[in-house]
Regions:
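Phosphate/nucleotide-binding beta-alpha loop and adjacent structural elements of enzyme active sites
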Residues: 1-123
Length: 123
């Protein structure tokens, strides 16, 4: 377990916490440690990654570039935080490692905004 935010690089961020889904990077927030997944794994193999980082999914994926390109893990990422994630996340993942198949699933519970991108490589 790591007490750190998922991000593209190892750094410090300012995070404004809020009730439920209200957390976000904000200069007026509390200073928190941020880590990239590549840094945490330090080259170790990973077979599955789940991202749901309240709109920072692309930043977290950028911090997993080596792991994705080297090991092609199964990936599940939230898509409902930012409208453009429906396009940018699959394109970015595909740019890191060709051969992924992409699936979108809308969960059947209330509230109905739990839309996820599933990425499965053909290896």
């Amino acid at each position: 377990l790591y007490n750190a935010a998922a991000w593209s690089i190892d750094t410090e961020l300012y995070f404004a916490g809020g009730a439920g889904r209200q957390g976000r990077v904000d200069a007026a927030g509390k200073k928190v440690r941020a880590r990239s997944l590549d840094s945490v794994l330090a080259g170790k193999k990973c077979t599955y990654i789940k991202y749901d980082v309240e709109g920072a999914d692309l930043e977290a994926i950028k911090g997993s570039e080596y792991t994705i390109s080297r090991y092609a893990p199964k990936i599940c990422s939230a898509l409902y935080h930012r409208p453009y994630d429906y396009i940018t996340l699959p394109l970015y993942i595909n740019s890191l490692c060709k051969g992924y198949k992409f699936y979108i699933r809308q969960e059947r519970y209330y509230p109905a905004w739990e839309t996820n991108l599933f990425c499965v490589h053909d290896k």
